[in-house]
Amino acid sequence: MCLFSPTRLLPLLFVLVGLNASGAGPVFNVLDYGAHHDGSASSTEAMRSAIQAAKAAGGGTVFVPAGNYVTGPIELVSDLVLQIDAGATLRFPAAKLPFTKGRQQGIECLTPVPLMGGHDLHNVTITGRGVLTTDNAEWLKIMPRTKATKDDPGTANGPNWERLLQDLEVKTPAPDEDYQKAAPELRPSFIRFMDSTNVLIEGIHFVGSPMWTIHLLYTDNAVVQNVIIETYPGVHTDGIAVDSSRNVRITSCYIDTGDDGIVIKSGKDADGRRVNRPTENVSIVNCTVHHAHGAVALGSEISGGIHNLVADNITCRGTAIGVRIKSRRGRGGSVEDVRFNNWTMEDVGEAINVTTDYQMEGEVKASEEPVSERTPVFRNIAISGMIIKRAKLAIDIKGLPEMPISGLRISDVIVSAKSGMRGSFTDALELRNVQVNADNGPAFLIQDSKELELDGVATRKPLADAPVVRLERCPGAIVRNNRAFAGTGTFLSVPAGELKNVVLEGNVLDGAKKPVEEAELILNSDTRNQERVIP
């Protein structure tokens, strides 16, 4: 039975009004307001004065000509075009900043003001071929760090933040002194728009970032295009974070970062469900991601839901993961009607990772619990048209026993990897025209899944000592139109007594020494994660 329906993936129709980079109204040159284009002194006040002049005029363009400028945080206003000309570099030194309302780790709280952006704005454009730069390492120096090693300067947030976070998660009023203690442990986003509409960011080159580079929070109708983000190896310097926002288009961007390239979020646990603002109608097209934890990552903060997303024509190289969709017990929320098409990946850790059983290093694994608002739901996800070279792990799918991942379809994928596909706790998983060429283990190991359909799966690298397909506890499985190539030892292996649960149709298995066998278990759910390489 196929629960997946392409018609359920709603078209992404964006009415992007008011996003005109050419601007309207007068032009305000920051040099006329005392900016220092040689970097000899701070231009913070000049930037502020030019922006306020544009505001007083009812809108306009603030122009930053070529030169080197040193500035503190820049608060934008509505009906504004900030044009940063080619040859202009704005450098933001690390500093302790005042607090404003925001969201940190999916929890509403006070956060440092962003280096650029604003709250409750409309019709704002940041454009040009200029450079915005800061030094992630300098921001880390002003923070107390824990668990530091020669390879990792330590966790992003220290014990004071963790204590504050615990208060916020249960909505206990946090004393001002707790915020003051946590302040040195927090960093701002480079650009953040909150509760804003009609936002355009285009052409800008980011070099370094304190934390997230572009953060769209509670924002409707936003475009990020032709942007270059180079923050690798900065700690937690995600490229573009779309957080409880709607109608967002990200196109033709290059991102080289030490964290996720493009990350989609909607709040964490009880606070995220209280806010209850999904991220929806997101289009990500023609982007390249280098390094990064995940090229395009959804979660794990999905408590408000993520709906109607397309990521098409993406190239990633050297990322820990390519496609990453993650959540865990306690989050709640749903990820549904999302599509990943036409990707190329090289030298990645895991090519495709979809899990509702995510846990960070050092966390205690959550125990199984009855289905409730705390249970995350993944359904109607399509992944297709991918060529993947030199992955460590091809595909990793893991749902929850109490809430399997439903309606996941993977099609037209060719992947070479050290280890093959592993999947568990799914409902109506479909693999169509999927080729996994793995160095070891079964090419396809699927456990505890019902209504599974394998149509046209294969390996061009058969192993004499491992089956191509291993199914364990998979009632209602259909295995059809598959081919065993010469040199295959066993094509399909199932535990003793389970072959009756599998329907075989139209397979060409004469290349296998054993087309089908019933054998003792070779792997179990506890060993399936031994090849995991992700942070």
Predicted feature descriptions by range:
Residues 23-535:
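Extracellular/periplasmic carbohydrate-active domains that bind, remodel
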Residues 14-22:
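Hydrophobic h-region of N-terminal signal peptides that target proteins for export
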